């Protein structure tokens, strides 16, 4: 009922494997189909953003009548470009000048709620430690047993220690304006920065992260905890998890790293980040993928999206199809990037309390920023990651402020996984089948109306809520051009001289059967068929089939044709089918005489040559061949060749693999792909999920209710596979990305089989 409707930019369908239930099947009505529902509500556009795949694009396209589809994915994204930044802040200081190496111990990991209990620091100059600083810090609370066990610091040791503000001021006075270095500096600098903000203390020191240096310079180490790196570098033993010892170890660690950097031609801190770019892509340091929304702005963007999806499945698959930031940057033309949900890079940084400049650096890469209803992120409250709903609202306020400062639109999205609130139970069952312990936690990520979304974000103020819910989402929709997910028309590959070879085969066979001057009915039929076939560029399809059939026959395996290809005389003359589609007639195998008149005589009409009586050739006395099945060519190609040829061939099971290999030989390894298939949850499987779900929870339900729940879970993607016989061939002047993505069947990176998506 809102006068201007929003646009949903973050929506999952049944092709988000075992995770979402939103349907886009053209057969479903608005009560089930989200595209038709959005259109019925008056929405101008809707995005499709499944997890790492584009498998709902065709159905969404067919479902859309008067609504624009925005084609995209929610990618599993890894930042391999600037996530491991060694130096933060501006500095041109040479390696041999003074650096303050420090470490802190805290009451916990969350810089918003926890506090510092010890600060230790050393001054490193020209490879030597020249000064030290150490202080306990009063936490104003009792330490937990876990922190006492981990750090060895007790409550008694903190009696009389300076306050948080006093300790911070003392440490910063010791550090001055010198660069600070720490192992996992993001943690240590984050606590220092948070304390400085709280007490109004200026803090602008540049920082160096020895953890990131280790990950980049020691790519094969695998694990990079301070003690592991120290042991690898043969540094002195130390009391780990005490600030003073950890700080000294960082001090001892930097000189060998600086020596490695000098061997690379570097001389000062400001050169480090640039030199690390090519190193970030390698190494064994684990990176957890985050989420990213990628929308296609135009046809170029769609092609790049298909390419990124394909590379994620083929080259960078690690449990998920990964999109690397470096690869996205190389293929960014025509793409629109959104910051995604709570699993996105930006929201994580906001929740982690990263400083404002770092948030701006992260957000600047995106084209638009996302915020979502706080109900989407209530799990953070249940898990103790935040302490109140208001804190979740503050996260969204921070993103809005970032958008305002950077001039980027902020969009409210739903992260839709099912259509209506009552559908949530089906997702609980699916998640339970995968073993998720929190499968039953409420998460109302259904397709919300514009009014519902405006109410969700009313705490931002009426005008801002309208901007993020309506104005900005429509703006993103306007950025996207109308796109067809698959280009129209036939894109036939090339076989050298295919039209000439087809003509030679056909006329050669015609002369073999009907003599040097075939009857006019034969000539006319061949001319009509060849004219349509060559004009519509179907000659490649015919010759492909002919070569496959001939190859099989040469190896001793018969091929059976079926279907309407039997209505094509050219197919018969070229050896694709054994069915002669001419009217019933006699032909002499010896002198080539033929008789088309006998079967047309009203006194004894025959529709099929095989039914005619036996007769001998009146010219040479040889028994006639009875031929012709009287099938019009239009049955196969339509009138004027308006139907693409569908040549169905049955190859021997023993020889089928050879036929596949021969197809690769004909068209090239890079232009032939196995046809992919999608396996979905069948009703019997869904019924098993329902029974197990109810049993594990000690619940009972009527048979009708069990059936209802099972039906609600059917049709959701489980896996992918390959068609036993289907092959997809693309033209030599095209790439598969011009048509669709590709992948390994069943997401198996160990197979060399590549299928269409």
For the regions a protein language model found, what residue spans apply to each?
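Phosphodiester-processing cores and adjacent nucleic acid-binding clamps
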Residues: 1-106, 110-115, 119-133, 140, ...
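Glycine-rich active-site loop/lid that clamps phosphate-bearing ligands
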Residues: 734-743
């Amino acid at each position: 009922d809102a006068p201007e409707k929003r646009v949903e930019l973050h929506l999952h369908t049944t092709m988000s494997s075992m995770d979402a239930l939103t349907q886009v099947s053209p057969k479903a009505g608005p009560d089930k189909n989200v595209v038709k529902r959005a259109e019925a509500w008056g929405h101008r556009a809707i995005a499709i953003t499944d997890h790492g795949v584009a498998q709902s694009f065709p159905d969404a396209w067919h479902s859309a009548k008067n609504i624009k589809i925005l084609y995209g994915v929610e990618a599993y994204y890894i930042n391999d470009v600037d996530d491991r930044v060694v130096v933060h802040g501006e500095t041109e200081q040479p390696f041999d000048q003074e650096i303050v190496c420090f470490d802190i111990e805290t009451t916990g990991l969350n810089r918003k709620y926890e506090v510092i209990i010890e600060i230790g620091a050393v001054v490193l100059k020209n490879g030597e430690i020249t000064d030290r600083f150490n202080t306990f810090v009063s936490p104003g609370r009792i330490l937990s047993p876990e922190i006492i066990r981990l750090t060895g610091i007790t409550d008694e040791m903190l009696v009389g220690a300076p306050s948080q503000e006093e300790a911070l001021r003392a440490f910063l006075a010791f550090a001055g304006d010198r660069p600070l270095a720490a192992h996992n500096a993001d943690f240590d600098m984050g606590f220092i920065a948070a304390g400085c903000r709280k007490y109004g203390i200026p803090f602008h020191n540049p920082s160096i992260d020895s953890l990131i240096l280790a990950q980049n310079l020691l790519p094969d180490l695998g694990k990079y905890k301070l003690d592991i790196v120290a042991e690898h570098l043969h540094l002195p033993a130390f009391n780990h998890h005490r600030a003073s010892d950890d700080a000294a170890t960082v001090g001892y660690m930097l000189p060998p790293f600086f020596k490695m950097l000098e061997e690379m031609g570097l001389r000062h801190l400001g050169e480090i980040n640039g030199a690390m770019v090519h190193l970030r892509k390698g190494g064994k340091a684990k990176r957890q993928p985050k989420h990213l929304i990628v929308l296609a702005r135009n046809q170029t963007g769609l092609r790049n999206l298909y390419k990124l999806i394909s590379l994620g499945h083929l080259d960078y698959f690690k449990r998920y199809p990964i999109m690397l930031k470096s690869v996205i940057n190389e293929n960014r033309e025509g793409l629109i990037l959104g910051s995604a949900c709570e699993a996105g890079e930006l929201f994580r940084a906001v929740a982690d309390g990263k400083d404002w400049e770092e948030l701006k650096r992260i957000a600047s890469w995106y084209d638009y920023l996302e915020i979502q209803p706080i109900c989407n992120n209530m799990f953070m409250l249940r898990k103790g990651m935040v302490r109140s709903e208001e804190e979740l609202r503050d996260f969204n306020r921070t993103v809005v402020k970032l958008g305002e400062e950077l001039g980027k639109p902020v969009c409210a999205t739903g992260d839709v996984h099912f259509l209506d609130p009552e559908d949530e139970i089906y997702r609980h069952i699916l998640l339970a089948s995968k073993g998720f312990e929190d499968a039953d936690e409420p998460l109302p990520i259904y397709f919300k109306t514009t009014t519902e979304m405006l109410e969700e974000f009313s705490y931002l103020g009426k005008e801002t809520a309208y901007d993020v819910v309506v104005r900005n989402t429509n703006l993103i929709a306007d950025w996207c051009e109308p796109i067809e997910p698959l280009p129209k028309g036939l894109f036939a590959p090339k076989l050298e001289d295919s039209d000439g070879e087809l003509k030679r085969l056909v006329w050669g066979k015609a002369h073999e059967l009907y003599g040097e001057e075939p009857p006019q009915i034969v000539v006319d039929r061949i001319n009509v068929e060849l004219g349509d076939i060559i004009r519509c560029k179907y000659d490649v399809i015919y010759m492909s089939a002919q070569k496959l059939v001939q190859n099989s026959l040469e190896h001793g395996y018969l091929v059976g044709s079926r279907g309407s290809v039997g209505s094509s005389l050219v197919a018969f003359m070229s050896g694709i089918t054994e069915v002669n589609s001419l009217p019933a007639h006699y032909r002499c195998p010896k002198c080539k005489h033929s008789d088309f008149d006998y079967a047309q005589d009203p006194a004894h009409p025959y529709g099929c040559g095989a039914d005619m009586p036996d007769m001998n050739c009146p010219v040479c006395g040889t028994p006639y061949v009875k031929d012709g099945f009287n099938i019009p060519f239009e049955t196969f190609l339509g009138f004027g060749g308006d139907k693409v040829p569908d040549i169905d061939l049955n190859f021997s099971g023993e020889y089928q693999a050879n036929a596949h290999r021969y197809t690769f030989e004909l068209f090239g390894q890079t232009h032939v792909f196995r046809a992919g298939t999608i396996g979905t949850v069948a009703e019997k499987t869904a019924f098993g999920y329902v029974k197990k779900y109810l049993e594990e929870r000690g619940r009972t339900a009527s048979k009708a209710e069990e059936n209802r729940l099972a039906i609600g879970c059917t049709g959701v993607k489980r896996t992918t596979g390959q068609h036993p016989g289907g092959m997809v061939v693309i033209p030599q002047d095209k790439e598969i990305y011009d048509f669709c993505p590709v992948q390994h069947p069943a997401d198996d990176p160990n197979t060399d089989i590549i299928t269409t998506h």
